């Protein structure tokens, strides 16, 4: 199957320039193509992942992906999709963000073999361009009327846009032209809001490299959820690729909780499963939705891809422990992941009566209520039911000498750490 046909089947193409020419080019040649990201933060979220998944599909089809981290464009900020001016960050912060993104993107691609990926930073070829060079060599190639007509600029004219952000499309066009000239890059991929920037690059390539220069652009549709809300966010905020911001367990749970109406679309977008495999999962969604086979597959595939097989095993282990209530097999790291959002208390490193301990920490409102809950078997320590009001909490009740997990009733968890 031609890679363009596969992308169309997956619903991953919104717009493309010269479809016939691109189809022929990717069938006959191994091409280099790129997608960029600006280091506006120290982590990608899953919304950022979408165009890079397309880039990875091209790599799987034998083409060479170029990952561009915008050390230069990141100092300005892309106005696309923004209603107001971005706040500029320091060069020091941008440099830190660049390195963080390099690590995350490095996990997604293969950097060896015939279709080895490469990673570039546009700061390397823009840092020595003087203002006069910029105006003479590039500014002269851009018609202001054309720039004003592009959606990314036109949508901001009423509220105002600085020259800095207005000129962003020139810098992105310079990137495409540079990669065309020095890396033989023929295709740029981006989100649907990048169409204006991509076509600006194609225009510059034709002016700089000649009318016969072959280059293409492809954008991806905006991904929305069936309920109309924005994809990539949970109640707790964005779902990050950085495990310190979104743990692998939280990441896994995000995908597990996918709506039945969205799961097949996400399987097509985000996994490398075949059409036959996805069709079978779609059938299961229709016939046995309660088994959530499609969601489990999606969560497993994504956690492995972004994190690792080990991270997936941890997420499954935590999920099983929380479902069964048997938490004794969890490590301290797994406890921190699985209980990140439960009420957390810090206890003194001392032996204390269970009833007093529950009240002192604030898990129980009074000794009377604490005794009643213990007597009725509603209190669990590390998954074990406690019915002895005389029990003493000591070091033996700690997991890895760090945590004690308290459960009240069937689902109310508390995490206790120690001074």
Swiss-Prot record:
Disulfide bonds: none annotated. Its EC number is 6.1.1.1. Its main location: cytoplasm. A motif ('HIGH' region) lies at residues 39-48. Residues 352-418 form the S4 RNA-binding domain. It is found in: Cytoplasm. It comes from the Bacteria. Catalyzes the attachment of tyrosine to tRNA(Tyr) in a two-step reaction: tyrosine is first activated by ATP to form Tyr-AMP and then transferred to the acceptor end of tRNA(Tyr). Belongs to the class-I aminoacyl-tRNA synthetase family. TyrS type 1 subfamily. NCBIfam families: tyrS. Homodimer. This is Tyrosine--tRNA ligase.
